Every structure is written in structure tokens, then in C-alpha cells.
Amino acid sequence: MPKLRSATSTEGRNMAGARALWRATGVKDNDFGKPIIAISNSFTQFVPGHVHLKDMGQLVAGAIEEAGGIAKEFNTIAVDDGIAMGHGGMLYSLPSRELIADSVEYMVNAHCADALVCISNCDKITPGMLMAALRLNIPVIFVSGGPMEAGKTKLSDKLIKLDLVDAMVAGADDRVSDADSEQIERSACPTCGSCSGMFTANSMNCLTEALGLSLPGNGSMLATHADRRELFLEAGRRIMDLTTRYYRDDDQSALPRNIANFNAFENAMTLDIAMGGSSNTVLHLLAAAIEAEVDFSMDDIDRLSRLVPHLCKVAPSTPKYHMEDVHRAGGVMGILGELDRAGLLHNDAYHVAGSNLAEVLAKYDIAQSKDEAVHKFFSAGPAGIPTTKAFSQDCRWDSVDIDREAGCIRTREFAFSQEGGLAVLSGNVALDGCIVKTAGVEVENHTFIGSARVYESQDDAVAGILGGEVVEGDVVVIRYEGPKGGPGMQEMLYPTSYLKSRGLGTKCALITDGRFSGGTSGLSIGHVSPEAAAGGTIALVNTGDRIEIDIPARSIKLAISDVELAARRTAMEALGKDAWKPVGRVRQVSMALKAYALLATSADKGAVRDTSKLG
């Protein structure tokens, strides 16, 4: 039977000083010997997805203490990618993932916590905490802050749904009046919660359900809805159950590495492809797999992308559906249920909500469940009232959406497409692969041949797009924005938004060793590996080169001869210390970012640290 980790700091005469300090935090005599549960909360007033989390840790703590544990809360940082977008702040977003993972490890190991509750929500916070949880391998459960309600407003007497991306596009579109742009801005992000589409934050929170590490509804129940309160309370109760199973009963299935095993990672990626999730999820799943010591790679993602249909289409891939609509249609469990019936899931995978995924689906998949409480749970809807408060409303849809032919979630037979929402491309431009979110690409753009327009930074690309340099038929190439070359692998939401605002969204392509926001749509190909700074071919592309993109064939090609490509590589290497560096780019890089870049790997490895350099 495993011994409580916390006994290290609570048992024995030589721990008198530590016990004295525990007492100073409120621990009583009869508390010693109980499991200590760490609560990692990411509350901050900087981020709408986290602004409502201040009291959530203590809500969970109360449930833990009622169930016989000791709860101790600490905080991590959280970067808002939308606010950091379009300027030097974006350099810090991806590196913050590693800091979050490390900070959770530091706090949990320094204080010998026995188990962990992760209260996360936005883009890098859920992945960072996931990496830490799998690194630590102690009982864990995730509970997120939940998605924002979709924005709604009337334009030209028509009620439309909105999100952050609509505000960005309208702000850069000269055809949109100042009044309309301001109206869109004021309506786009009406409540607390993670941005309302299938962007990175919501994608990752959905994937924790598929990995088996969070409760049903975690990824889709609105932040504002009163029903979400029960998810936090149940998370507190469940972590105590997991803790008891492991430490008292020696039940190894309660540990995250045994829940999030290879089959669970396949389930998560299958869900991601089926729902057209953010391409960033590829980066984060690869990183999490490394922490879990699971051999899950780009090859596995490529294989799955050829098998899994696109069953759920959500903003930014369509203006019709947002996360509130996904929840009404049964949430993640609704999508997983259809995947299970299509024979595409490992339904024997362990899950924190039941003995295995099959058991959880039997109860929570509204297409098969007759449980009235479950149907009521998924009827939770938006109130349409701007607020920063959690649990502030109890509105419900008149009915849940079980239309699997023309609804938000479809069966395999009636899928939005038989090709999934993400694809891995490879070729001489990306020898180790790159990612495209096919869910956001028009069918006519699935094959594209164009002329390269090369930029050494996102800033230069934005200036080129807004200045009219980029024209129909161009393939915009943005390089030296990878994990090492940026450093920090910036998101390219502004370049893609500005292409849309200039009417070029379906008339140009964009490829980069950087990455894209989950809000990106259009022929946007990111994560090109190896990156330019690591000697990748993308560094050898010249303006005017022909680039051929073929999504059905999963290929991307720089159309020059092998002889010419080799000559360019030789010329680059001859530059010595100036080789594989951007030409003419002026960028202030802090010591913190330089330290990150020193160990950063390319995107095909999850942009994690290259631990081989640590000895």
C-alpha cells in the first residue's frame, strides 16, 4: 500500500518544525494523517477565462474537507493570448506553458502533496497543468472555468453570433463602419469564460474529458451557468475517491498515467479531429505524451486523421455554432458517443467519472441515455446578460439537440465531411510535418498552388498584408517564428484575420513555423518542422518560389530541384554564426526568452525542452 507523500512532512519528531508551520496554515491535531490535496488555481484579473475563478478553489476545498481531506490552494500564472496577440507579448505565451508546468511541480513536490486538483481554463494553462499532472503522476482531476457565452448583436436587422475573431476582422476591415466595428467589439465577448468557439482553450478542456481526467460537461458547460458549480463540488469529491483508491487500496488505475495511457491519447486526438479542434492541441498533446512517457507522435496523428470524420463543426469554422450549442447537443460525451458507435474509440479506457469510458458514455451520451437529470444538465444555456460572475444564471434551452443528421453533432453517416478537422502534411518544406486545421479550409482550397511571399517575422507579414504587398495567389511564408526562432512560437491570428479583412481569406495560403490561434480559419498551415532556426527548409524559401499544397495527398512541396535546394543549404551554412537567423529583423529578446529558446524543440516534438542537453 503506497504511503501518503505528505507523511514526509507531517510524521516523526524531526518534523516538529514542519508541523508547526502546517498548524499555522489552519491544520488541526486531528487533521494530521489525512491526505493533503493541492488545488492549483489559475485565477487572474487579466484574463476573462479566469476572472471568475477567485472563489473556485475554496469551493473545491470545502468538498475535499467534507470528504475527509486537507485542501491547500496555490496559484499559477495565466497569459491571455488574445490580449498578448499582435505585439511582443505573444512571445511569452507558449513559454508560459513550461513555467506553469514547473510551478505546479515545484509547489506539489516542495510541500509533499498527495493529490492534485487543477482549476484551469485558457490556452496554455490547461496544457501546462496537464504536463505537470502527468509528470507528477499522483491522483489528479481537472475542472475548468468553462466557456464564455457567444456574443450576439443585430447588424442590418439580422441577429448574428460573434466571438473575438469577428472583432479582430471587423477592426481591420475598412469596409466596416466605425459604428459597426464598435458594436461588434462591444458584443463579441459578453461574459467571463474562455472564448466561445472551438478555440485552443475550449479544445483542450474538451480533450481532458476524452483523456479521462475531467468530468462530463467540463469542456462545454458555460462559465455563467449555475450547473457548473456542481462540477467544482464533484471534482472535490472525486479527487478524494481517487486518492483513497490509490493510497488505501493500492489501485493503480487511479493514477493519471494509467488513465491517460496510449489508448486515451488516441481517444483525445480522435475527438480533436472529429470536432475540428485548434491545431495547438497537437502541440500540447505531444508535449503531454512526453511527460506521460507515452510513445504518441505525429505519425499517430497522421494515421488517425485519415480515419476520423468531421462530426462537429463549431466557430471559427462556422458562424452557426458555438460552445453553448455543443453543450446543448450533448457536449464532448455526445461526440464521443458517435465516435464509439463508429468503432473509433477505445471505450475500455479508464475515466475519473466511472470505471471506464463505456460506462461514462452509457450515462452521459444523450443519444443513448434516458437519464432525465443528464438531459437537464445538457439543456443548460446562455442568458445573454454581460457578466464576469460564475454561476450567475440558470437559463435552459427548451430541448436538447439530438438531431444527428443536420444538428451541431452528426453521426458518421451524416458527417460534415468524411475527412477529419485536422491533417498532417509533409514534404520538402516540412520534413518532420506540419499541421492544417482542415475544418476551417474551404473545399476549393484543399489543393493550392501559389507564389511564395516570404517574411522574416509576423510583424513584417502584417505590414505586408495591410500595405497591399500580398495579392491573390500568394503563399505567405512567415518564418523564424518557431519555438527557438521566435522565440516562443507566436500565434498568427492577426495575419490570417487581416487576410480575411482584405478579401484574401480564400485566395491566399499562409505557412509558418509559428502556430495559429484556435480562432484561425482559412488555408493556414503551421508548426512547420524543423523550424527555420533549427535548419528547416522553410528558411531556404525565396519570394517567388512555387509552393504546392495538396491536403488530400497530405503533401506540401517547395517546387525547386533537389540540386537547387542543396545549393541554398550550402550557401546558408557558409554564413557561419549568422546561419539560420532572420535577416534584418530587430527584436528585443529578454533573458527569460533566451533561456527558453536554448532548450526548445520544434513543434513536431511538442515544443518541449530538449532534455538531452541537460546531461
Swiss-Prot record:
<feature type="binding site">
    <location>
        <position position="122"/>
    </location>
    <ligand>
        <name>[2Fe-2S] cluster</name>
    </ligand>
</feature>
<keyword id="KW-0100">Branched-chain amino acid biosynthesis</keyword>
<dbReference type="InterPro" id="IPR004404">
    <property type="entry name" value="DihydroxyA_deHydtase"/>
</dbReference>
<feature type="active site" description="Proton acceptor">
    <location>
        <position position="517"/>
    </location>
</feature>
<keyword id="KW-0028">Amino-acid biosynthesis</keyword>
<dbReference type="InterPro" id="IPR037237">
    <property type="entry name" value="IlvD/EDD_N"/>
</dbReference>
<comment type="subunit">
    <text>Homodimer.</text>
</comment>
<dbReference type="Pfam" id="PF00920">
    <property type="entry name" value="ILVD_EDD_N"/>
</dbReference>
<keyword id="KW-0456">Lyase</keyword>
<feature type="binding site">
    <location>
        <position position="491"/>
    </location>
    <ligand>
        <name>Mg(2+)</name>
    </ligand>
</feature>
<dbReference type="GO" id="GO:0009097">
    <property type="term" value="P:isoleucine biosynthetic process"/>
</dbReference>
<dbReference type="GO" id="GO:0051537">
    <property type="term" value="F:2 iron, 2 sulfur cluster binding"/>
</dbReference>
<dbReference type="GO" id="GO:0009099">
    <property type="term" value="P:L-valine biosynthetic process"/>
</dbReference>
<dbReference type="InterPro" id="IPR020558">
    <property type="entry name" value="DiOHA_6PGluconate_deHydtase_CS"/>
</dbReference>
<keyword id="KW-0479">Metal-binding</keyword>
<feature type="binding site" description="via carbamate group">
    <location>
        <position position="124"/>
    </location>
    <ligand>
        <name>Mg(2+)</name>
    </ligand>
</feature>
<comment type="pathway">
    <text>Amino-acid biosynthesis; L-isoleucine biosynthesis; L-isoleucine from 2-oxobutanoate: step 3/4.</text>
</comment>
<dbReference type="InterPro" id="IPR042096">
    <property type="entry name" value="Dihydro-acid_dehy_C"/>
</dbReference>
<feature type="binding site">
    <location>
        <position position="123"/>
    </location>
    <ligand>
        <name>Mg(2+)</name>
    </ligand>
</feature>
<keyword id="KW-0001">2Fe-2S</keyword>
<protein>
    <recommendedName>
        <fullName>Dihydroxy-acid dehydratase</fullName>
        <ecNumber>4.2.1.9</ecNumber>
    </recommendedName>
</protein>
<dbReference type="InterPro" id="IPR000581">
    <property type="entry name" value="ILV_EDD_N"/>
</dbReference>
<keyword id="KW-0408">Iron</keyword>
<comment type="function">
    <text>Functions in the biosynthesis of branched-chain amino acids. Catalyzes the dehydration of (2R,3R)-2,3-dihydroxy-3-methylpentanoate (2,3-dihydroxy-3-methylvalerate) into 2-oxo-3-methylpentanoate (2-oxo-3-methylvalerate) and of (2R)-2,3-dihydroxy-3-methylbutanoate (2,3-dihydroxyisovalerate) into 2-oxo-3-methylbutanoate (2-oxoisovalerate), the penultimate precursor to L-isoleucine and L-valine, respectively.</text>
</comment>
<comment type="similarity">
    <text>Belongs to the IlvD/Edd family.</text>
</comment>
<dbReference type="GO" id="GO:0000287">
    <property type="term" value="F:magnesium ion binding"/>
</dbReference>
<feature type="modified residue" description="N6-carboxylysine">
    <location>
        <position position="124"/>
    </location>
</feature>
<dbReference type="GO" id="GO:0005829">
    <property type="term" value="C:cytosol"/>
</dbReference>
<keyword id="KW-0460">Magnesium</keyword>
<feature type="binding site">
    <location>
        <position position="195"/>
    </location>
    <ligand>
        <name>[2Fe-2S] cluster</name>
    </ligand>
</feature>
<dbReference type="InterPro" id="IPR056740">
    <property type="entry name" value="ILV_EDD_C"/>
</dbReference>
<dbReference type="Pfam" id="PF24877">
    <property type="entry name" value="ILV_EDD_C"/>
</dbReference>
<dbReference type="GO" id="GO:0004160">
    <property type="term" value="F:dihydroxy-acid dehydratase activity"/>
</dbReference>
<comment type="pathway">
    <text>Amino-acid biosynthesis; L-valine biosynthesis; L-valine from pyruvate: step 3/4.</text>
</comment>
<feature type="binding site">
    <location>
        <position position="81"/>
    </location>
    <ligand>
        <name>Mg(2+)</name>
    </ligand>
</feature>
<keyword id="KW-0411">Iron-sulfur</keyword>
